[in-house]
């Protein structure tokens, strides 16, 4: 047996070994040699055969799409999925979640494997070549898209200069914004991306930001760039003439101490880190340039070519001054509809003194809170997400819901009244003289209108959109392309026919049918905005919570010349309220309840219905015959042409009066200025709109413990019920990964 074993060993040694395939993977090391541990094998069900993807680490240079997809997958791994509109949870346990979906658990398993492969190493400091046209996977999933969004290398006293607060004061930059600044010089092929809060002042040549061109002036524009939204890319405008004496674009960047960065304290869970740290690398508070490696996942604001073409059509040669501009923007959800409408508004402000904005989206208002349709008049561009520029409306109506599904008739009546108010009261104005028009070189004879519609494009939503379009009679329609869907066209199935508007023939016997001579409506087809997986971190419900909390922490002003400020140093439960009396002959006289179930509230239950509720403060524009009582069960609110909504308020508490002074005393939290609050006469309350949970708690460090908050036990805290209910299946679902038995 020993001889046979020896011969077998000799034959095995002499036989050629199979060659190992040469790996095409070139490992990229950040610090020293990088050794990749072999990932654990996991049994997964593959629904469709897919080619094996390339290795994680490759030496090829990515394309732009591959680069963003890779960065987005990293963002999902690092940020996780958190919803501020959902109950908070600690670590991996959750006592408030009823269950997680299979998709969520699969994503968690995938992220665990990635962390095991990465070994929790930081690989952000790997640079990428500027050539983004070649194909192939990227070098590391941990790369930030900084080399794409910023093409600027600051050098002191060359293209970058620091300015002290005293030097700004000597240059007559006394606009109420303290702090130092920096002057940046951008070449024609350079761009700069900044995260945070800052004031932007163009000094030389025209620059572009958020699809908006800003010309040199002494005016400063507040810019809000949280990491929860696309970051603005500042670059020289493409319309700049190449033969100018100086091809450098100079801009001044200063601190913007508006107070909204107080979200770092934790006022809205999930949004505490969107403003990054207080001190920036340039020595400016809250200003974080994206130059070099960046500590958090970000993605830039991109302007598709179709957007640029549509915006460029607003030139002086194309806009007919005899027919006021009325632009309607429509498209599905998540298409960039509101973003483009905001860019359209900003570019119109380059030629017009004022621009009107009609908000038809109940879910996500641009200049106000949700559940309101309104008309806003602006004279300055809005450079930031919707929650950063709340404004007082010119005329608005409160529907008390985030969708017109439950009140389509009231929705159309409110929008019809707003369109009529614009046409008869705001479209043509003689407020400004010819001298003002000449000095500012802007048109002030009429006010253009931008209509932002809802993203509901099917069924009833399509019918509502068609009615709005027929009422507004827009001169320009900007339509976003809908994603193609497979429609079954078999027997018995039909699709919705395309909308077509036809004018009735003119009949002298019926003068009302005379056609109105209007310019042919121009339609622009727009492509959807670039999609990033970072957008999936926050749902529309999360953004509504953020908008509501920041709205009640804001301080609004009657004029847009005074910027909005926020005070988020303390929660709403610790904010000093306004005390207003409710009763006949008092400051607030009547209460109206709207929405489903409102007719069932009895008069004696009115304090219970109002306590802790969000209400709309409205003024009466005319006389209205109504019952001389504070509240009448089932009473309908006054007509829309007699009511104007000033804003929203939270009734923090109320107390009953006495025999000498009957009525109720309300403690209101509202961002309205005193001049607007004194005009309010009635309250409108809907049961579909409630204050989000972050507005009811003390979110400060140490403000909440197991016993309660604010020195009170949980049983003494109003509006909150923290008692859990133990039910079967109420705990979080978990998958067991150690069951590997055959036949199961």
Curated annotation (Swiss-Prot):
Residue ranges, compositional bias (Basic residues): 39-55
Region (Disordered): 1-131
GO cellular component: nucleolus
Annotated binding of ATP, by residue: 331-338
Comp. bias (Polar residues): 61-82
Keywords in alphabetical order: ATP-binding, Kinase, Nucleotide-binding, Nucleus, rRNA processing, Transferase
UniProt biased composition (Acidic residues): 100-111
Top-level taxonomic group: Eukaryota
Ranges of compositional bias, category Basic and acidic residues: 112-125
Biological process (GO), any one: rRNA processing
Sequence ranges of Low complexity compositional bias: 1-14, 83-99
The keyword Transferase is assigned to this record: yes
Entry annotated with the keyword Disulfide bond: no
EC number, UniProt record: 2.7.1.-
Location(s) in or outside the cell: Nucleus, Nucleolus
Entry GO MF terms: ATP binding; polynucleotide 5'-hydroxyl-kinase activity
PANTHER family cross-referenced by the UniProt entry: CLEAVAGE/POLYADENYLATION FACTOR IA SUBUNIT CLP1P, POLYNUCLEOTIDE 5'-HYDROXYL-KINASE NOL9
Known role: Polynucleotide 5'-kinase involved in rRNA processing.
Family to which this protein belongs: Belongs to the Clp1 family. NOL9/GRC3 subfamily.
Protein name, UniProt field: Polynucleotide 5'-hydroxyl-kinase GRC3
Gene behind this protein: GRC3
């Amino acid at each position: 047996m020993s001889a046979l074993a020896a011969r077998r060993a000799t034959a095995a040694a002499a036989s050629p070994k199979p060659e190992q395939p040469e790996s095409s993977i070139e490992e990229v090391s950040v610090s020293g040699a990088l050794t990749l541990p072999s990932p654990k094998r996991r049994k997964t069900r593959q629904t469709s055969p897919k080619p094996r993807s390339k290795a994680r680490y490759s030496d090829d240079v990515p394309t732009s799409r591959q680069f963003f997809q890779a960065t987005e997958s990293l963002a999902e791994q690092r940020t996780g999925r958190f919803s501020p509109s959902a109950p908070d949870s600690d670590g991996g346990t959750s006592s408030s979640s009823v269950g997680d979906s299979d998709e969520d658990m699969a994503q968690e398993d995938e992220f665990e494997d990635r962390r095991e492969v990465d070994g929790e190493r930081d690989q952000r400091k790997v640079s990428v070549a500027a050539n983004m046209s070649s194909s192939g996977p990227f070098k590391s999933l941990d790369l930030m898209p900084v080399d794409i969004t910023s093409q600027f290398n600051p050098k002191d006293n060359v293209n970058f200069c620091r300015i002290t607060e005293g030097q700004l004061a000597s240059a007559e930059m006394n606009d109420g914004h303290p702090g130092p600044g920096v002057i940046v010089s951008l070449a024609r092929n350079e761009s700069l991306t900044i995260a945070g809060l800052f004031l932007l002042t163009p000094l030389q040549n025209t620059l572009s930001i958020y699809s908006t061109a800003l010309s040199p002036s002494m005016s400063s524009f507040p810019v809000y760039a949280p990491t929860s939204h696309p970051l603005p890319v500042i670059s020289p405008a493409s319309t700049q003439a190449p033969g100018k004496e100086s091809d450098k674009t100079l801009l001044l960047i200063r601190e913007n101490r508006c107070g909204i960065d107080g979200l770092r304290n934790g006022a809205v869970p999930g949004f505490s880190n969107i403003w990054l740290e207080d001190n920036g690398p340039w020595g400016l508070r809250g200003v974080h340039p994206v130059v070099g490696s960046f500590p958090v996942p970000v993605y830039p604001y991109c302007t598709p070519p179709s957007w640029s073409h549509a915006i460029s059509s607003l030139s002086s040669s194309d806009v007919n001054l005899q027919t006021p501009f009325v632009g309607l923007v429509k498209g599905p959800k998540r298409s960039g509809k509101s973003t483009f409408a905001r860019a359209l508004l900003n570019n119109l402000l380059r030629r017009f003194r004022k621009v009107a904005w009609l908000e038809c989206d109940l879910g996500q208002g641009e200049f106000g809170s949700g559940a309101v349709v309104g008309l806003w008049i602006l004279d300055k561009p809005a450079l930031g997400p919707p929650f950063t520029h709340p404004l007082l409306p010119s005329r608005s109506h409160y529907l008390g819901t985030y969708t017109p599904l439950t009140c389509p008739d009231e929705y159309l009546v409110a929008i019809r009244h707003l369109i009529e108010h614009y046409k008869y009261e705001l479209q043509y104005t003689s407020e400004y003289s010819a001298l003002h028009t000449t000095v500012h070189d802007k048109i002030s004879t009429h006010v253009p209108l931008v209509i932002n519609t809802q993203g509901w494009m099917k069924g009833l939503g399509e019918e509502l959109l068609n009615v709005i379009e027929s009422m507004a009679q827009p001169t320009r329609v900007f339509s976003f392309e809908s994603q193609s869907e497979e429609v079954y066209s078999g027997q018995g199935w039909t699709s919705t026919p395309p909308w077509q508007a036809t004018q009735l023939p003119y009949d002298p016997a019926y003068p009302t049918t005379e056609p109105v001579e209007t310019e042919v409506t121009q339609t622009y087809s727009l492509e959807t905005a670039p999609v990033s997986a970072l957008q999936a971190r926050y749902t529309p419900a999360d953004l509504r919570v953020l908008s509501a909390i920041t709205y009640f922490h804001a301080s609004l002003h009657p004029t847009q010349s005074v910027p909005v400020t926020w005070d988020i140093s303390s929660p709403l439960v610790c904010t000093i309220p306004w005390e207003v009396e409710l009763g006949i002959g008092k400051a607030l006289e009547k209460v109206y309840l709207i929405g489903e179930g409102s007719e069932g509230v009895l008069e004696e239950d009115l304090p219970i219905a109002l306590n802790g509720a969000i209400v709309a403060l409205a003024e009466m524009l005319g006389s209205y015959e109504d019952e001389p009582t504070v509240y009448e069960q089932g009473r309908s609110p006054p007509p829309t042409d007699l009511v104007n909504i000033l804003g929203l308020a939270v009734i923090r508490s109320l107390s009953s009066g006495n025999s000498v002074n009957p009525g109720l005393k309300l403690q209101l939290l509202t961002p309205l200025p005193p001049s607007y609050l004194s005009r309010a006469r009635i309250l409108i309350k809907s049961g579909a709109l409630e204050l989000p949970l972050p507005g009811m708690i003390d979110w400060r460090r140490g403000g909440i413990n197991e016993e309660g908050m604010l020195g009170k036990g949980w049983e003494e805290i109003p509006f909150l019920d923290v008692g859990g209910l133990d039910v079967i299946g109420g705990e979080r679902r978990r998958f067991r990964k150690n069951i590997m038995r055959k036949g199961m």
